[in-house]
A protein has these predicted regions:
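Canonical Rossmann dinucleotide-binding motif of NAD(H)/NADP(H)-dependent dehydrogenases/reductases
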Residues: 1-29
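Conserved glycine-rich Rossmann-like NAD(P)H-binding loop of the short-chain dehydrogenase/reductase
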Residues: 24-41
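The beta1-alpha1 cofactor-binding region of Rossmann-like NAD(H)/NADP(H)-dependent oxidoreductases
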Residues: 35-36, 59-70, 103
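Substrate-binding pocket helix/loop in short-chain dehydrogenase/reductase
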Residues: 96-98, 102-107
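A short, exposed helix-loop element centered on a Lys and neighboring polar residues
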Residues: 121-122, 167
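Catalytic loop of short-chain dehydrogenase/reductase
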Residues: 135-161, 166-167, 171-175, 190
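C-terminal helical subdomain
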Residues: 185, 203-262
Length: 271
């Protein structure tokens, strides 16, 4: 029985991944900073294949390296080994240009989106190197491909750095483990969750520009759709430095090509 650990997985894309992994026969360890959300997520997971899979929840702040080590230790103690570790935890940035962001807002984005991935990868790599195998996935996002937009500068900066870090760590793994520890990227594309309409978990809604909504309606997908594609490919992957991509160039081109015939409205704006 294999085990997956997912950070930031009490809701949204992380929880959808957890459910799909459990449906696929994995023991699942979810983690989040919000204990109430975590308990609700655990109850949902425990109803999936209860006869032959297990779920565990661990409160974890990814900006705290000790929390991440305790997350690994809890998973290893419960299930023996950790086969897949996913750095999923992330926050959006307030919809403001850099000159209007506070130092606290800047630090929070970098601490969660970048440092959280670095700290999580460090813990997972050490554990997987010791056990002799494993896969580490870090979630890419807007900015990973050098895309730029006012209001997303700090988020994009963090995600671009995550891409460089992950690819460089994959090279280190090749040198140190011969690729036994596979360090990879997960590129889900545009997901329709409250992540894109709220910043830092704030209840205040971000009203997206109409142009942005139009693009999201063409290219976006619900996380349930995305995990049906990416999770089986993560499970089957045997390559170090792999990139599991949902919104490929071909898929994006097809969406734009058919946008005039297939109307999609994720924001309920149709009159």
């Amino acid at each position: 029985m294999k085990t997956v650990v997912i950070t930031g997985s009490a809701r949204g894309f992380g929880l959808c991944q957890a459910k799909k992994f459990k449906e696929s026969g994995f023991n699942v360890v979810i983690s989040d900073i919000n204990e109430n959300n975590l308990q609700s997520a655990l109850e949902a997971l425990q109803s999936i294949r209860p006869q032959d899979t297990k779920a565990l929840s661990v409160v974890c702040d990814v900006t705290n390296p000790q929390d991440l080590q305790e997350l690994w230790d809890s998973a290893a103690q419960a299930f023996g080994t950790v086969d897949i570790w996913i750095n999923n935890a992330g926050v959006n940035s307030p919809d403001k240009p850099v000159c209007e962001l506070t130092e606290k807002e800047i630090a929070f984005i970098l601490d969660v989106d970048l440092k959280g991935t670095v700290y999580g990868s460090r813990v997972a790599f050490a554990g997987m190197r010791a056990q002799g195998h494993g896969q580490i996935y870090s979630v890419e996002g807007y900015g990973s491909n050098d895309a730029m937009m006012t209001g997303l500068t700090m988020y994009g900066t963090a995600k671009r750095a995550v891409t460089f870090f992950t690819r460089s760590l994959a090279k280190e793994s090749q040198d140190l483990t011969g690729g036994q520890v596979k360090v990879c990227r997960l590129t889900p594309g545009i997901m329709i969750t409250d992540f894109i309409t709220h910043a830092n978990g704030d209840a205040t809604r971000i009203e997206l520009p109409e142009k942005t909504k139009k693009v999201y309606n063409i290219l976006g997908d619900y996380p349930e759709t995305i995990v049906d594609y990416v999770v089986p490919r993560m499970i089957a992957n045997e390559k170090n430095d792999a990139d599991i991509v949902w919104l490929t160039n071909a898929r994006a081109f097809s969406r734009f090509l058919t946008a005039g015939f297939k109307k999609r409205d994720f924001f309920g704006d149709k009159k």
